[in-house]
Design a protein with these regions (language model features):
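Membrane-embedded transmembrane alpha-helical bundles that form the catalytic cores
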Residues: 1-509
Protein backbone atom coordinates (compact mmCIF):
# COMPACT_ATOMS: atom_id res chain seq x y z
CA UNK A 1 0.00 0.00 0.00
CA UNK A 2 1.71 3.21 -1.19
CA UNK A 3 1.38 6.51 0.62
CA UNK A 4 -1.18 7.69 -1.91
CA UNK A 5 -3.07 4.42 -1.50
CA UNK A 6 -3.07 4.99 2.25
CA UNK A 7 -4.54 8.45 1.69
CA UNK A 8 -7.09 7.00 -0.74
CA UNK A 9 -8.01 4.31 1.80
CA UNK A 10 -8.58 7.03 4.35
CA UNK A 11 -10.87 8.97 2.00
CA UNK A 12 -12.82 5.82 1.04
CA UNK A 13 -13.33 4.78 4.66
CA UNK A 14 -14.33 8.33 5.61
CA UNK A 15 -16.93 8.39 2.83
CA UNK A 16 -18.50 5.15 4.08
CA UNK A 17 -18.22 6.40 7.67
CA UNK A 18 -20.19 9.59 7.00
CA UNK A 19 -22.82 7.78 4.92
CA UNK A 20 -23.67 5.49 7.83
CA UNK A 21 -25.95 6.37 10.77
CA UNK A 22 -24.09 8.12 13.57
CA UNK A 23 -24.67 5.32 16.09
CA UNK A 24 -22.79 2.70 14.04
CA UNK A 25 -19.97 4.86 12.70
CA UNK A 26 -17.60 3.61 15.34
CA UNK A 27 -18.21 0.07 14.04
CA UNK A 28 -17.25 1.19 10.53
CA UNK A 29 -14.07 2.69 11.95
CA UNK A 30 -13.29 -0.52 13.85
CA UNK A 31 -13.74 -2.64 10.71
CA UNK A 32 -11.64 -0.19 8.69
CA UNK A 33 -8.89 -0.34 11.32
CA UNK A 34 -8.76 -4.12 11.48
CA UNK A 35 -9.02 -4.32 7.70
CA UNK A 36 -6.00 -2.05 7.42
CA UNK A 37 -4.05 -4.00 10.02
CA UNK A 38 -4.82 -7.37 8.42
CA UNK A 39 -3.74 -6.06 5.01
CA UNK A 40 -0.41 -4.81 6.34
CA UNK A 41 0.45 -7.32 9.09
CA UNK A 42 -1.86 -10.34 9.10
CA UNK A 43 0.65 -12.37 11.12
CA UNK A 44 0.73 -9.58 13.70
CA UNK A 45 -3.03 -9.63 14.23
CA UNK A 46 -2.95 -12.13 17.14
CA UNK A 47 -0.53 -9.87 19.01
CA UNK A 48 -2.65 -6.72 18.86
CA UNK A 49 -5.68 -8.84 19.80
CA UNK A 50 -3.77 -10.26 22.77
CA UNK A 51 -2.76 -6.80 24.00
CA UNK A 52 -6.31 -5.54 23.54
CA UNK A 53 -7.87 -8.47 25.39
CA UNK A 54 -5.44 -8.64 28.31
CA UNK A 55 -5.53 -4.87 28.87
CA UNK A 56 -9.32 -4.76 28.75
CA UNK A 57 -9.65 -7.64 31.21
CA UNK A 58 -7.02 -6.23 33.56
CA UNK A 59 -8.70 -2.81 33.65
CA UNK A 60 -12.07 -4.41 34.42
CA UNK A 61 -10.50 -6.54 37.15
CA UNK A 62 -8.92 -3.45 38.74
CA UNK A 63 -12.30 -1.70 38.70
CA UNK A 64 -14.10 -4.73 40.18
CA UNK A 65 -11.56 -5.01 42.99
CA UNK A 66 -12.10 -1.34 43.77
CA UNK A 67 -15.88 -1.70 43.76
CA UNK A 68 -15.70 -4.79 45.97
CA UNK A 69 -13.43 -2.96 48.39
CA UNK A 70 -15.84 -0.03 48.62
CA UNK A 71 -18.72 -2.41 49.37
CA UNK A 72 -16.73 -4.07 52.14
CA UNK A 73 -15.78 -0.67 53.58
CA UNK A 74 -19.42 0.27 54.05
CA UNK A 75 -20.07 -2.78 56.20
CA UNK A 76 -16.72 -2.78 58.02
CA UNK A 77 -15.90 -1.42 61.42
CA UNK A 78 -13.73 1.70 61.56
CA UNK A 79 -10.58 -0.06 62.75
CA UNK A 80 -10.68 -2.53 59.82
CA UNK A 81 -11.16 0.01 57.02
CA UNK A 82 -7.47 0.80 56.59
CA UNK A 83 -6.62 -2.90 56.21
CA UNK A 84 -9.42 -3.40 53.68
CA UNK A 85 -8.19 -0.47 51.58
CA UNK A 86 -4.62 -1.75 51.68
CA UNK A 87 -5.66 -5.28 50.69
CA UNK A 88 -7.73 -4.01 47.76
CA UNK A 89 -4.86 -1.82 46.59
CA UNK A 90 -2.44 -4.75 46.76
CA UNK A 91 -4.73 -6.86 44.59
CA UNK A 92 -5.16 -4.02 42.10
CA UNK A 93 -1.40 -3.53 41.98
CA UNK A 94 -0.86 -7.24 41.36
CA UNK A 95 -3.26 -7.21 38.39
CA UNK A 96 -1.71 -4.04 37.00
CA UNK A 97 1.85 -5.37 37.29
CA UNK A 98 0.89 -8.70 35.72
CA UNK A 99 -0.60 -6.93 32.69
CA UNK A 100 2.40 -4.61 32.39
CA UNK A 101 4.87 -7.49 32.59
CA UNK A 102 2.93 -9.55 30.07
CA UNK A 103 2.60 -6.83 27.45
CA UNK A 104 5.95 -5.11 27.87
CA UNK A 105 7.54 -8.55 28.12
CA UNK A 106 6.01 -9.55 24.79
CA UNK A 107 7.24 -6.30 23.25
CA UNK A 108 10.73 -6.85 24.66
CA UNK A 109 11.00 -10.43 23.38
CA UNK A 110 9.88 -9.55 19.86
CA UNK A 111 11.83 -6.31 19.60
CA UNK A 112 15.06 -6.97 21.47
CA UNK A 113 15.85 -10.68 21.16
CA UNK A 114 18.03 -10.19 18.08
CA UNK A 115 19.78 -7.17 19.62
CA UNK A 116 20.63 -9.13 22.77
CA UNK A 117 21.80 -12.13 20.74
CA UNK A 118 24.03 -9.73 18.84
CA UNK A 119 25.80 -8.81 22.10
CA UNK A 120 27.06 -12.41 22.27
CA UNK A 121 27.79 -12.82 18.56
CA UNK A 122 24.78 -15.07 17.95
CA UNK A 123 22.91 -14.94 14.65
CA UNK A 124 19.51 -13.17 14.61
CA UNK A 125 16.33 -15.22 14.83
CA UNK A 126 14.30 -12.78 12.74
CA UNK A 127 11.26 -12.80 15.02
CA UNK A 128 8.12 -11.14 13.74
CA UNK A 129 7.78 -7.48 14.77
CA UNK A 130 4.05 -6.70 14.46
CA UNK A 131 3.02 -3.40 12.90
CA UNK A 132 2.91 -0.58 15.44
CA UNK A 133 3.57 -2.83 18.45
CA UNK A 134 5.46 -0.18 20.43
CA UNK A 135 2.78 2.43 19.81
CA UNK A 136 -0.25 0.30 20.66
CA UNK A 137 1.51 -1.28 23.65
CA UNK A 138 2.42 2.09 25.16
CA UNK A 139 -1.06 3.43 24.42
CA UNK A 140 -2.76 0.42 26.02
CA UNK A 141 -0.52 0.44 29.08
CA UNK A 142 -1.13 4.17 29.53
CA UNK A 143 -4.86 3.41 29.61
CA UNK A 144 -4.33 0.64 32.16
CA UNK A 145 -2.26 2.88 34.44
CA UNK A 146 -4.86 5.64 34.22
CA UNK A 147 -7.58 3.19 35.29
CA UNK A 148 -5.35 1.93 38.12
CA UNK A 149 -4.76 5.52 39.28
CA UNK A 150 -8.49 6.28 39.17
CA UNK A 151 -8.29 8.85 36.38
CA UNK A 152 -11.36 7.38 34.67
CA UNK A 153 -13.54 4.27 34.66
CA UNK A 154 -12.64 1.39 32.32
CA UNK A 155 -14.40 0.88 29.00
CA UNK A 156 -16.89 -1.98 29.48
CA UNK A 157 -17.39 -2.62 25.77
CA UNK A 158 -14.55 -4.74 24.36
CA UNK A 159 -15.20 -3.67 20.76
CA UNK A 160 -15.08 0.03 21.64
CA UNK A 161 -11.83 -0.50 23.52
CA UNK A 162 -10.45 -2.44 20.54
CA UNK A 163 -11.10 0.62 18.38
CA UNK A 164 -9.08 2.80 20.76
CA UNK A 165 -6.13 0.39 20.47
CA UNK A 166 -6.35 -0.25 16.72
CA UNK A 167 -7.47 3.11 15.21
CA UNK A 168 -5.62 2.71 11.94
CA UNK A 169 -4.11 6.16 11.25
CA UNK A 170 -2.06 6.17 14.45
CA UNK A 171 -0.90 2.56 14.12
CA UNK A 172 1.75 3.41 11.53
CA UNK A 173 3.96 5.57 13.74
CA UNK A 174 1.82 7.21 16.41
CA UNK A 175 1.12 9.52 18.05
CA UNK A 176 0.56 7.65 21.31
CA UNK A 177 -3.03 8.54 22.18
CA UNK A 178 -4.73 8.97 25.55
CA UNK A 179 -8.08 7.31 26.15
CA UNK A 180 -9.75 10.32 27.76
CA UNK A 181 -8.80 12.46 24.75
CA UNK A 182 -9.98 9.97 22.11
CA UNK A 183 -12.95 8.18 23.69
CA UNK A 184 -15.71 10.63 22.67
CA UNK A 185 -14.11 11.35 19.30
CA UNK A 186 -13.96 7.66 18.38
CA UNK A 187 -17.62 7.23 19.31
CA UNK A 188 -18.84 9.83 16.85
CA UNK A 189 -16.16 12.23 15.70
CA UNK A 190 -16.52 15.97 15.52
CA UNK A 191 -16.66 18.72 12.96
CA UNK A 192 -15.04 17.78 9.65
CA UNK A 193 -13.18 20.37 7.58
CA UNK A 194 -12.13 18.51 4.44
CA UNK A 195 -9.92 21.28 2.98
CA UNK A 196 -7.97 21.56 6.25
CA UNK A 197 -7.60 17.78 6.47
CA UNK A 198 -6.51 17.50 2.83
CA UNK A 199 -3.95 20.30 3.20
CA UNK A 200 -2.42 18.57 6.23
CA UNK A 201 -2.24 15.26 4.36
CA UNK A 202 -0.68 16.99 1.35
CA UNK A 203 1.87 18.76 3.53
CA UNK A 204 2.79 15.45 5.14
CA UNK A 205 3.22 13.78 1.76
CA UNK A 206 5.40 16.66 0.57
CA UNK A 207 7.64 16.48 3.62
CA UNK A 208 8.01 12.73 3.29
CA UNK A 209 8.26 12.24 -0.49
CA UNK A 210 9.81 15.48 -1.70
CA UNK A 211 12.20 16.27 1.16
CA UNK A 212 12.86 13.21 3.36
CA UNK A 213 13.16 10.65 0.57
CA UNK A 214 15.32 13.03 -1.45
CA UNK A 215 17.69 13.51 1.49
CA UNK A 216 17.88 9.76 2.12
CA UNK A 217 20.58 8.99 -0.52
CA UNK A 218 22.83 11.64 1.04
CA UNK A 219 22.39 10.11 4.48
CA UNK A 220 23.03 6.59 3.19
CA UNK A 221 26.10 7.68 1.21
CA UNK A 222 27.72 9.05 4.37
CA UNK A 223 26.57 6.72 7.15
CA UNK A 224 26.47 3.41 5.25
CA UNK A 225 29.94 3.77 3.72
CA UNK A 226 32.77 1.63 5.14
CA UNK A 227 34.54 3.21 8.09
CA UNK A 228 37.23 5.70 7.13
CA UNK A 229 35.78 6.43 3.69
CA UNK A 230 34.85 10.02 4.42
CA UNK A 231 36.40 12.87 6.34
CA UNK A 232 34.73 15.11 8.88
CA UNK A 233 33.22 17.52 6.36
CA UNK A 234 31.18 14.73 4.80
CA UNK A 235 30.15 13.64 8.30
CA UNK A 236 28.80 17.14 8.99
CA UNK A 237 26.88 17.18 5.70
CA UNK A 238 25.57 13.70 6.42
CA UNK A 239 24.28 14.50 9.89
CA UNK A 240 22.65 17.72 8.66
CA UNK A 241 20.95 15.73 5.90
CA UNK A 242 19.86 13.18 8.51
CA UNK A 243 18.39 15.90 10.72
CA UNK A 244 16.27 17.00 7.75
CA UNK A 245 15.40 13.47 6.62
CA UNK A 246 14.39 12.19 10.04
CA UNK A 247 12.27 15.22 10.90
CA UNK A 248 10.47 15.29 7.54
CA UNK A 249 10.02 11.51 7.51
CA UNK A 250 8.59 11.30 11.02
CA UNK A 251 6.62 14.55 11.15
CA UNK A 252 5.50 14.10 7.54
CA UNK A 253 4.04 10.72 8.40
CA UNK A 254 2.35 12.19 11.47
CA UNK A 255 0.85 15.00 9.37
CA UNK A 256 -0.47 12.46 6.85
CA UNK A 257 -2.17 10.26 9.44
CA UNK A 258 -3.44 13.25 11.43
CA UNK A 259 -5.04 14.55 8.24
CA UNK A 260 -6.66 11.16 7.63
CA UNK A 261 -7.98 11.17 11.21
CA UNK A 262 -9.45 14.64 10.63
CA UNK A 263 -11.52 13.19 7.76
CA UNK A 264 -13.42 11.33 10.51
CA UNK A 265 -13.62 14.43 12.69
CA UNK A 266 -10.93 13.08 15.03
CA UNK A 267 -8.06 15.26 16.26
CA UNK A 268 -4.94 13.31 17.15
CA UNK A 269 -2.54 14.65 19.76
CA UNK A 270 0.13 17.05 18.50
CA UNK A 271 3.41 15.18 18.06
CA UNK A 272 5.77 17.82 16.65
CA UNK A 273 5.94 21.54 17.26
CA UNK A 274 8.79 22.98 15.19
CA UNK A 275 11.55 21.29 17.25
CA UNK A 276 14.48 22.89 15.44
CA UNK A 277 13.39 26.27 16.81
CA UNK A 278 13.96 25.00 20.36
CA UNK A 279 16.17 27.13 22.62
CA UNK A 280 17.40 24.27 24.83
CA UNK A 281 17.60 20.50 24.76
CA UNK A 282 14.69 20.30 27.20
CA UNK A 283 12.67 22.58 24.95
CA UNK A 284 13.58 20.37 21.97
CA UNK A 285 12.20 17.27 23.66
CA UNK A 286 9.01 19.11 24.54
CA UNK A 287 8.58 19.71 20.80
CA UNK A 288 9.80 16.38 19.32
CA UNK A 289 7.72 13.19 19.56
CA UNK A 290 5.56 14.99 22.10
CA UNK A 291 3.27 12.04 22.80
CA UNK A 292 6.17 9.74 23.77
CA UNK A 293 7.67 12.45 25.95
CA UNK A 294 4.32 13.02 27.67
CA UNK A 295 3.92 9.26 28.22
CA UNK A 296 7.37 9.01 29.79
CA UNK A 297 6.72 12.12 31.90
CA UNK A 298 3.41 10.87 33.32
CA UNK A 299 4.15 7.17 33.77
CA UNK A 300 7.93 7.07 34.41
CA UNK A 301 9.38 10.47 35.34
CA UNK A 302 6.87 11.64 37.94
CA UNK A 303 6.36 8.24 39.64
CA UNK A 304 10.14 7.83 39.86
CA UNK A 305 10.97 11.41 40.93
CA UNK A 306 8.24 11.38 43.59
CA UNK A 307 9.01 7.87 44.87
CA UNK A 308 10.09 7.30 48.47
CA UNK A 309 13.65 6.13 47.66
CA UNK A 310 14.32 9.23 45.55
CA UNK A 311 12.74 11.47 48.19
CA UNK A 312 15.01 9.94 50.84
CA UNK A 313 18.03 10.39 48.57
CA UNK A 314 17.08 14.02 48.00
CA UNK A 315 16.80 14.65 51.74
CA UNK A 316 20.20 13.05 52.30
CA UNK A 317 21.74 15.22 49.57
CA UNK A 318 20.33 18.39 51.13
CA UNK A 319 22.67 18.21 54.09
CA UNK A 320 25.79 17.72 51.97
CA UNK A 321 25.10 19.74 48.81
CA UNK A 322 22.43 22.26 49.77
CA UNK A 323 18.72 22.75 49.23
CA UNK A 324 18.96 23.81 45.57
CA UNK A 325 20.88 20.65 44.61
CA UNK A 326 18.48 18.47 46.59
CA UNK A 327 15.45 19.98 44.86
CA UNK A 328 16.97 19.40 41.42
CA UNK A 329 18.26 15.88 42.10
CA UNK A 330 14.97 13.98 41.50
CA UNK A 331 14.52 15.73 38.14
CA UNK A 332 18.13 15.04 37.18
CA UNK A 333 17.91 11.33 37.98
CA UNK A 334 14.47 11.12 36.38
CA UNK A 335 15.78 12.55 33.13
CA UNK A 336 18.62 10.04 33.00
CA UNK A 337 16.18 7.17 33.57
CA UNK A 338 13.64 8.44 31.04
CA UNK A 339 16.17 8.95 28.25
CA UNK A 340 17.89 5.65 28.95
CA UNK A 341 14.48 4.06 28.37
CA UNK A 342 13.88 6.20 25.27
CA UNK A 343 17.22 5.00 23.92
CA UNK A 344 16.29 1.37 24.56
CA UNK A 345 12.86 2.04 22.98
CA UNK A 346 14.76 2.74 19.76
CA UNK A 347 16.89 -0.38 20.12
CA UNK A 348 19.00 -2.37 22.58
CA UNK A 349 22.28 -1.58 20.84
CA UNK A 350 25.18 0.54 22.07
CA UNK A 351 24.50 3.50 19.79
CA UNK A 352 20.89 3.90 20.94
CA UNK A 353 21.72 3.38 24.61
CA UNK A 354 24.49 6.00 24.49
CA UNK A 355 22.24 8.35 22.51
CA UNK A 356 19.65 8.13 25.27
CA UNK A 357 22.24 8.61 28.01
CA UNK A 358 23.78 11.55 26.12
CA UNK A 359 20.45 13.37 26.18
CA UNK A 360 19.62 12.31 29.72
CA UNK A 361 22.95 13.41 31.20
CA UNK A 362 22.80 16.83 29.50
CA UNK A 363 19.28 17.37 30.84
CA UNK A 364 20.36 16.17 34.29
CA UNK A 365 23.31 18.58 34.40
CA UNK A 366 21.03 21.35 33.16
CA UNK A 367 18.57 20.66 35.99
CA UNK A 368 21.35 20.68 38.61
CA UNK A 369 22.81 23.95 37.30
CA UNK A 370 19.45 25.66 36.82
CA UNK A 371 19.86 27.97 39.87
CA UNK A 372 23.20 29.21 38.50
CA UNK A 373 21.69 29.77 35.05
CA UNK A 374 18.88 31.74 36.63
CA UNK A 375 21.26 34.04 38.52
CA UNK A 376 23.39 34.54 35.41
CA UNK A 377 20.33 35.42 33.34
CA UNK A 378 19.27 37.96 35.95
CA UNK A 379 22.68 39.62 35.88
CA UNK A 380 22.76 39.72 32.06
CA UNK A 381 19.06 40.42 31.54
CA UNK A 382 19.55 42.76 28.57
CA UNK A 383 21.76 40.27 26.76
CA UNK A 384 19.62 37.20 27.42
CA UNK A 385 16.46 39.05 26.34
CA UNK A 386 17.98 40.11 23.01
CA UNK A 387 17.04 38.63 19.65
CA UNK A 388 20.65 37.74 18.96
CA UNK A 389 20.92 35.67 22.13
CA UNK A 390 17.71 33.86 21.21
CA UNK A 391 19.21 32.96 17.81
CA UNK A 392 22.38 31.80 19.55
CA UNK A 393 20.36 29.51 21.84
CA UNK A 394 18.52 28.01 18.84
CA UNK A 395 21.79 27.35 16.99
CA UNK A 396 23.45 25.95 20.12
CA UNK A 397 20.54 23.55 20.66
CA UNK A 398 20.65 22.49 17.01
CA UNK A 399 24.34 21.59 17.36
CA UNK A 400 23.71 19.64 20.59
CA UNK A 401 20.86 17.71 18.96
CA UNK A 402 22.92 16.90 15.86
CA UNK A 403 25.76 15.53 17.96
CA UNK A 404 23.17 13.14 19.36
CA UNK A 405 21.99 12.24 15.87
CA UNK A 406 25.43 10.70 15.16
CA UNK A 407 24.67 8.06 17.80
CA UNK A 408 21.12 7.65 16.53
CA UNK A 409 22.13 7.00 12.90
CA UNK A 410 25.50 5.24 13.13
CA UNK A 411 25.51 1.45 13.34
CA UNK A 412 27.56 1.43 16.56
CA UNK A 413 28.61 3.90 19.22
CA UNK A 414 32.22 3.45 18.10
CA UNK A 415 31.33 4.53 14.57
CA UNK A 416 29.64 7.64 15.95
CA UNK A 417 32.69 8.61 18.01
CA UNK A 418 35.03 8.06 15.05
CA UNK A 419 32.87 10.14 12.71
CA UNK A 420 32.66 13.01 15.20
CA UNK A 421 36.41 12.83 15.79
CA UNK A 422 36.99 13.18 12.06
CA UNK A 423 35.14 16.50 12.04
CA UNK A 424 38.18 18.10 13.70
CA UNK A 425 41.01 15.68 12.94
CA UNK A 426 40.36 14.97 9.25
CA UNK A 427 37.80 17.35 7.67
CA UNK A 428 38.77 16.83 3.96
CA UNK A 429 36.46 19.47 2.52
CA UNK A 430 37.31 18.44 -1.05
CA UNK A 431 35.21 15.28 -0.59
CA UNK A 432 31.98 17.31 -0.31
CA UNK A 433 30.65 16.85 -3.84
CA UNK A 434 27.20 15.92 -5.10
CA UNK A 435 28.49 12.77 -6.81
CA UNK A 436 29.92 11.56 -3.48
CA UNK A 437 26.59 12.34 -1.80
CA UNK A 438 24.60 10.29 -4.32
CA UNK A 439 22.35 13.14 -5.39
CA UNK A 440 22.01 14.91 -8.74
CA UNK A 441 22.24 18.71 -9.14
CA UNK A 442 18.52 18.83 -9.95
CA UNK A 443 17.60 16.84 -6.86
CA UNK A 444 19.88 19.03 -4.76
CA UNK A 445 18.09 22.16 -5.98
CA UNK A 446 14.64 20.63 -5.34
CA UNK A 447 15.76 19.58 -1.87
CA UNK A 448 17.10 23.06 -1.11
CA UNK A 449 13.84 24.71 -2.21
CA UNK A 450 11.84 22.20 -0.17
CA UNK A 451 13.89 22.86 2.97
CA UNK A 452 13.57 26.64 2.50
CA UNK A 453 9.79 26.30 2.10
CA UNK A 454 9.63 24.12 5.22
CA UNK A 455 11.71 26.66 7.15
CA UNK A 456 9.47 29.53 6.02
CA UNK A 457 6.25 27.73 7.01
CA UNK A 458 7.81 26.70 10.33
CA UNK A 459 8.95 30.27 11.03
CA UNK A 460 5.44 31.54 10.37
CA UNK A 461 4.07 28.88 12.72
CA UNK A 462 6.61 29.81 15.37
CA UNK A 463 5.28 33.37 15.18
CA UNK A 464 1.67 32.27 15.63
CA UNK A 465 0.62 32.18 11.97
CA UNK A 466 -1.63 29.25 11.02
CA UNK A 467 -0.75 28.76 7.35
CA UNK A 468 -3.09 25.80 6.92
CA UNK A 469 -5.99 27.65 8.51
CA UNK A 470 -5.31 30.70 6.36
CA UNK A 471 -5.28 28.64 3.15
CA UNK A 472 -8.39 26.67 4.14
CA UNK A 473 -10.26 29.94 4.71
CA UNK A 474 -9.52 31.32 1.23
CA UNK A 475 -12.15 31.49 -1.48
CA UNK A 476 -13.06 28.18 -3.11
CA UNK A 477 -11.11 28.79 -6.37
CA UNK A 478 -7.95 29.61 -4.40
CA UNK A 479 -8.34 26.55 -2.17
CA UNK A 480 -8.81 24.29 -5.16
CA UNK A 481 -5.85 25.84 -6.96
CA UNK A 482 -3.59 25.30 -3.94
CA UNK A 483 -4.76 21.72 -3.36
CA UNK A 484 -4.56 20.76 -7.04
CA UNK A 485 -1.22 22.50 -7.53
CA UNK A 486 0.19 20.91 -4.40
CA UNK A 487 -0.97 17.45 -5.47
CA UNK A 488 0.62 17.85 -8.89
CA UNK A 489 3.83 19.13 -7.29
CA UNK A 490 4.06 16.10 -4.99
CA UNK A 491 3.33 13.75 -7.90
CA UNK A 492 6.00 15.38 -10.05
CA UNK A 493 8.64 16.07 -7.41
CA UNK A 494 8.13 13.17 -5.01
CA UNK A 495 10.70 10.37 -5.01
CA UNK A 496 9.21 7.26 -6.54
CA UNK A 497 10.35 3.70 -7.01
CA UNK A 498 10.82 0.49 -5.07
CA UNK A 499 11.65 1.02 -1.43
CA UNK A 500 9.81 4.32 -1.22
CA UNK A 501 6.53 3.33 0.38
CA UNK A 502 4.99 3.65 3.79
CA UNK A 503 7.23 0.76 4.84
CA UNK A 504 10.23 3.07 4.51
CA UNK A 505 9.03 5.34 7.31
CA UNK A 506 11.86 5.36 9.85
CA UNK A 507 9.44 4.61 12.70
CA UNK A 508 7.20 2.21 10.74
CA UNK A 509 8.25 -0.89 12.68
CA UNK A 510 8.58 0.66 16.12
Amino acid sequence: MSLFMLAAYGFACAAVYHLCPAKIRWVVLLLASYGFYASRSLAGLPFILATTGTTWLAALAIARIGESGKARLKAAEKERKKAIRAAARRRQRAVMLAALLLNFGLLAVLKYTDDVRGWFGASPLGLLLPLGISFYTFQSMGYLLDVYNGKYAPQRNLARFALFVSFFPQLIQGPIGRYDQLEKQLEGGGQVDVPRAFLLMLWGLAKKMVIADRALPMVSAVFDAPGGTWGGAMAVVGVLAYSVQQYCDFSGGIDLVAGIAELFGIRLAENFRRPYFAVSLGDFWRRWHISLGAWMRDYVFYPFALSRPVSRLSKAAKGRFGAAFARALPAALGNILVFALVGVWHGATSNYILWGLYNGVILAVTALLEPRYKRLNERCARLTASRGFHVFRVLRTFVIVNIGWFFDRCATAGDAVRMMGGVFARPEWAQVRLDNLGISPLDARILAVGVLLLAAVSLLGENGKDVRGWLAARALPIRWAVMLGGTIAVLLLGVWGSGFSEASFIYFNF
